[in-house]
Amino acid sequence: MNPEQFQMALAEKGIELSDDQMKQFHDYFKMLVEWNEKMNLTAITDEKEVYLKHFYDSISAAFYVDFTKFDTICDVGAGAGFPSLPIKICFPHLKVSIVDSLKKRMTFLDALAEKLGLTDVHFYHDRAETFGQNKAHREKYDLVTARAVARMSVLSELCMPLVKKGGSFLVMKAAQAEQELQTAEKAIKLFGGKVEEHFAFALPVEESERNIYVITKTKETPNKYPRKPGTPNKLPIE
């Protein structure tokens, strides 16, 4: 998917990108490739692959969820900024917080946000377990996203505490998502969530499976969650 195809594909979904926004994506791609030479940000560096598997894939959530209804977003373990920064480029009104445990990725994201002229974007170098117990952030976000490889039961413990009551947790998964959901149902309920919607689709060009789950926060997360750093991964609630 080249940049022109990317722009057309989004337009077909009702997301019209201006020349300025297209330049932001171009600069994002250039910086990603440049910085990737000195630090491991992504295994995907081919332009067409980046536009499809990073940019388009990140924005695909907006085909099913109305981002104009949200004000604040937190992206847990965003790595090189996915999915939150491509979403931010498309929906500039969003106030985005990104938390990641690797300092070098924070350095990249800071430089990237400055280059792209992104405002209302904040980066926090922290473990998700610690961040979720921080009163300044706990249950403060309209929407929390995760595009991480961790199991859904683990992601729920890391992300649900950050979602405000009535807000949503958006889980983006590839294949085997249904199986993961079954093992995560206990955790989702415990942390105050309810699975509201599931969208399954294929990524264009390569036709690979994608799944998006919208989990609504119906009640507050018990204070003891998330547990200490490392515990959710070692002893997931399933």
UniProtKB/Swiss-Prot annotation:
GO terms for cellular component: cytosol. CDD domains: AdoMet_MTases. The keyword Nucleotide-binding does not apply. Its EC number is 2.1.1.-. Keywords: Cytoplasm, Methyltransferase, rRNA processing, S-adenosyl-L-methionine, Transferase. It is found in: Cytoplasm. GO terms for molecular function: rRNA (guanine-N7-)-methyltransferase activity. S-adenosyl-L-methionine binds at G77, F82, A128, E129, R147. Gene3D superfamilies: Vaccinia Virus protein VP39. Specifically methylates the N7 position of guanine in position 535 of 16S rRNA. HAMAP family: 16SrRNA_methyltr_G. PANTHER family: S-ADENOSYL-L-METHIONINE-DEPENDENT METHYLTRANSFERASES SUPERFAMILY PROTEIN (PTHR31760:SF0). Belongs to the methyltransferase superfamily. RNA methyltransferase RsmG family. This is Ribosomal RNA small subunit methyltransferase G. The gene is rsmG.
